[in-house]
A protein has these predicted regions:
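Surface-exposed binding/hinge segments that line
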Residues: 157, 295-397
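Gly/Pro-rich hinge or "lid" segments in bacterial periplasmic/extracellular proteins
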Residues: 205, 210-212, 218-222, 230-233, ...
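Alpha-helical secondary-structure segments
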Residues: 119-140, 189, 275-284, 340-344, ...
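Detector for C-terminal structural segments
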Residues: 41-196, 534-569, 650, 656-664, ...
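N-terminal lobe/hinge region of extracytoplasmic solute-binding protein
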Residues: 168, 172, 191-251
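Aromatic- and charge-enriched surface segment that lines or borders ligand/interaction sites
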Residues: 118-123, 130, 244-309, 338, ...
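Append "and occasionally in soluble cytosolic enzymes with long acidic Gly/Pro-rich linkers
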Residues: 237, 244, 248, 424, ...
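Extracellular/periplasmic solute-recognition and catalytic clefts
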Residues: 292-299, 424-440, 456-519, 530, ...
Length: 749
């Protein structure tokens, strides 16, 4: 960033000419004081180099830029490049480009308007959001392909659907609490094209994000949260059905304590009382090595709270030991049990201020045995801790970890539930679950209790879903999309003489071609950009939605308030207009200019040279699905093929359209790509994306780097903090797109 110095006044004092004749200069001939002004520029700041992270060690070679400068940076320090839309800060004469991790963190943790021209935190949030969106659009971790109108089609015997409509934040699984059923058995059958897996009690168990169908069931069987995060307008609010009193205290050390008193009449589905212990149990459990072993993933549930680091390192034997400079403690000091119905949580100053800080007080009750086995939670005045049997081991395995694994897929009434319904049964063969009314449920955040006695949640196939509805196999088809399917659904309802009704709303989300953006060619920005240039996204959206939708250029909902404000503030996004020439240009600029032998590219599939120092094992072993195109070694360097391995989901019109719109696209071939695919079920696809056996299907060898599925925004809260981290200790557990933005690295050497 150039800084112009103040004008310098240079006084040129001319001494009398007595040196020649030893005479004084007369007053009227005295030289006038002359001055001149000139602009002097500081040397332009050095722009920090963006370097590969491969084969480099976090904490030794580099750390995150946000960890270095984040807390001290305000929006007033940021300069936006008017041509690229990228954001920069200058520190000690060095100009740093701000990456996705930095921007996503600053969006929620750096909203103080002090020292800036912004009036309040909302305006600062919007500016960070705009800068984040512009960078996301440039790096393109995934390609949005359509955003559409959603149509929900119902059996007319389900009443209240028009008076209590669904919307982007209020899905049928939430809305049915206001509906009634005139069917003889007082039931509703909900269909979803996404598979159930049986992970209902904690749908995100072992994963970075939950499966959509599992998440729906979890919403039905879990409830009584202190902060309602699923509301009709998508906002976060205190839940008056649960919370009797709450307070916030800003402490001298910069931490913040939330104290929450719950109602004393809350009970689980079996009538057993719900106390403060039940609210802190799951979060505490999933901050331990016990849960990390069970889930194959460290959920770090209490990461933002005081005492987390010390508590998370406790393994049952090392209280007081020093580990990585931290004194281990069996006590979680930031979680307190004040009395049977009051708990307090203290947020670490590192995570404050926070734009959505009400979320820090959001906890939901869990029956203790589900995640603790026979262990208990105790508070002797210094904080909460588990009794010793929580950490009991059988060899190298935590006994309670095995209990947790079973609980994660428990689908009956072995343990009670806190939500509006309980799971009576689950059939893994046809992916269906039967839920029954919880008679002890106190109500949702509006105090509403459901009247429909039975909910059947089942897997449906989009090709036959309307026939299923007509045959009585389902009562609700939610999220109908695609031109043909939408037209068919509307036509069926209009001609049904009142047997079927529908509602519709604009979707908060989009269908996408997603990537494992750290693997194979998809790890390179230019490859993702080239695919976008090759595809005709506008035509794809029009063909798929039949005119009931369009396309978005980033991860946003066009109805969201921050999007509207960002557009008003001049946000500019690349629409990636179809152009094979543009695709080739970005590929050539990115180094895809070779053939497999390291010679100049002429035709066929392109290759990129990867220097040996930057080649990781996954790069060296990369190949197309059929093995015809492999990374080759020429001299000391490696050459990776421009081969995309795509996993598409079966019985999905979106997959069908991608066959022609992506895989067999003439532009794709002309640009030098080869695309190969597999069609399979949703859960195995997720395992390939995660490169982990979260659902038990992953083979152990990474292969696929492109996937088609969808993104949905079920809350008005927009927060991707930590989801774009480059810190390896958090990356696998938190990464949303598996992308490492090179601008997010601060180099130590």
């Amino acid at each position: 960033m150039k800084k112009i110095l103040a004008l310098l006044l240079v006084a040129m004092m001319v001494i009398s000419l007595a040196a020649c004749n030893n005479k004084e200069t007369p007053d009227n001939s005295q030289s006038e004081v002359q001055s001149e002004s000139s602009q002097v520029e500081e040397p332009e700041a050095v722009v920090a180099e963006l370097k590969s992270l491969k084969n480099k060690e976090y904490g030794v070679d580099y750390v995150s830029l946000y960890s270095k400068f984040g807390k001290e940076t305000s929006i007033a320090d940021v300069e936006e490049d008017p041509e690229t839309g990228f954001a920069y800060i200058e520190k000690d004469g060095v100009k740093y480009e701000l990456g996705l991790d930095f921007l996503s963190m600053a969006m929620v943790y750096n909203t103080d308007p002090a020292g800036s021209d912004y009036a309040n935190a909302d305006e600062v949030y919007v500016e960070w959001w705009k800068l984040y969106m512009q960078r996301w659009n440039a790096l393109l971790p995934e390609i949005p392909l359509y955003s559409n109108e959603y149509y929900d089609l119902y059996n007319a015997k389900i009443k209240g659907v028009e008076e209590h409509q669904t919307n982007p934040y209020w899905t049928p699984a939430l809305a049915l609490i206001d509906w009634t059923s005139e069917k003889e058995d007082n039931s509703i059958i909900i269909g979803n094209t996404t598979d159930l897996s049986g992970k209902f009690r904690y749908a995100v168990f072992g994963a970075s994000s939950p499966g959509a169908a599992d998440n729906d069931v979890e919403k039905l069987i879990e409830g009584l949260e202190t902060v309602a995060t699923y509301t009709k307008d998508g906002s976060y609010i205190w839940n008056p059905t649960v919370v009797v009193e709450h307070s916030e205290t800003e402490n001298d050390d910069g931490s913040k304590t939330f104290t929450v008193k719950i109602a004393e009449d809350l009970v689980f589905s079996d009538g057993s009382p719900i106390t403060a212990k039940n609210y802190v149990a799951r979060a505490m459990a999933f901050s331990t090595p016990v849960a990390a072993q069970a889930a194959g993933k460290d959920h770090m549930a209490l990461m933002q709270y005081v005492g987390y680091k010390a508590f998370s390192l406790y393994d049952g034997t090392n209280d007081g030991a020093e580990v990585d400079g931290v004194t281990v403690s069996k006590v979680m000091s930031g979680i307190r049990l004040i009395d049977d119905y009051t708990f307090a949580v203290t947020v670490d100053p590192e995570y404050l201020p926070y734009y959505y800080d009400i979320a820090y007080a959001g906890f939901a009750p869990t029956y203790l045995k589900v995640w603790l086995g026979d262990a208990d939670i105790v508070d002797d005045g210094e904080g909460c801790y588990f009794t010793d049997n929580f950490y009991e081991k059988n060899g190298d395995t935590y006994v309670v970890a095995e209990q947790m694994k079973k609980s994660a897929t428990n689908t009956d009434t072995t343990y009670p539930y806190s939500g509006a319904y309980v799971v009576k049964s689950y059939d893994n063969s046809d992916k269906s679950a039967i839920l029954e009314l919880n008679p002890n449920f106190k109500g949702n955040y509006e105090g509403v209790k459901p009247s429909i006695e039975k909910v059947v949640y089942k897997k449906i196939v989009s090709d036959t879903q309307l026939e299923d509805l007509q045959a009585g196999g389902i009562d609700c088809i939610s999220g109908i999309t695609g031109g043909d399917e939408t037209n068919e659904a509307i036509d069926m309802a209009d001609k049904s003489e009142g047997k079927y009704v529908y509602t519709h709303y604009s979707r908060a989300g989009y269908g996408k071609l997603g990537f494992r953006a750290d693997f194979g060619p998809a790890q390179y920005t230019e490859v993702r950009q080239a695919i976008a240039y090759c595809m005709d996204r506008a035509k794809f959206a029009k063909d798929f939605t039949g005119g009931y939708g369009g396309v978005v250029d980033g991860p946003y909902y066009s109805g969201a308030w921050m999007y509207k404000e960002a557009v008003a503030n001049g946000m500019e996004l690349n629409a990636y207009a179809t152009s094979v020439d543009s695709a080739i240009a970005v590929l050539e600029e990115g180094g895809w200019v070779y053939d497999k032998d390291g010679n100049d590219y002429v035709e066929g599939v392109r290759y990129k040279k990867i220097p040996a120092a930057e080649a990781e094992e996954k790069d060296i072993n990369y190949q197309s699905k059929d093995g015809a195109y492999k990374t080759t070694k020429v001299g000391d360097d490696y050459y990776m093929p421009l081969a995309i391995n795509w996993y598409g989901t079966s019985n999905n019109p979106f997959t069908d359209q991608l066959m022609t719109g992506f895989m067999e696209n003439d532009n794709i071939k002309a640009a030098g790509f080869v695309v190969q695919n597999t069609i399979g079920e949703f859960s195995p696809m997720l395992d390939e994306l995660y490169q982990a056996a979260v659902y038990g299907y992953y083979s152990g060898s990474p292969l696929y780097n492109a996937f088609n599925f969808a993104t949905g925004y079920n809350s008005a809260v927009y927060d991707y903090a930590y989801n774009l981290t480059i810190d390896p200790s958090m990356y696998d557990d938190y990464s949303q797109w598996y992308i490492k933005d090179l601008a997010d690295a601060y180099w130590l050497k």
